Amino acid sequence: MLKVVGMKEINAIFEVTDRLGINREWIEIPLSPESPGVVRKLPNGKYEIVVDAGVPIEQWAAAMETELKKLL
């Protein structure tokens, strides 16, 4: 189980958000993962991406992309 979000997870998130054309300044990634992970649009227009602590990042990134597309 993931305890802290590291560069591997952040790079996987940015790979997806870059592909979707979302500016990195509009992404908030808490360094504490949770289970389940969460993708939501905040009232200020930014996207909060909370990494899922119990799912490998490669698998979770695909689910995250699906959720982000719903919010665009």
Residue ranges and their predicted role:
Residues 6-15, 33-35, 41, 53:
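Residue-level detector of functional hotspots within protein domains
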Residues 49-63:
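Short pre-active-site segment immediately N-terminal to the catalytic Zn-binding motif
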Residues 40-53, 69:
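Short, charge-rich amphipathic interface segments used for partner binding and complex assembly
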Residues 1-25:
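A metal-dependent hydrolase signature that marks the N-terminal structural subdomain at the beginning
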Residues 29-46, 58:
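Catalytic zinc-binding patch centered on the HExxH motif and its immediate surroundings
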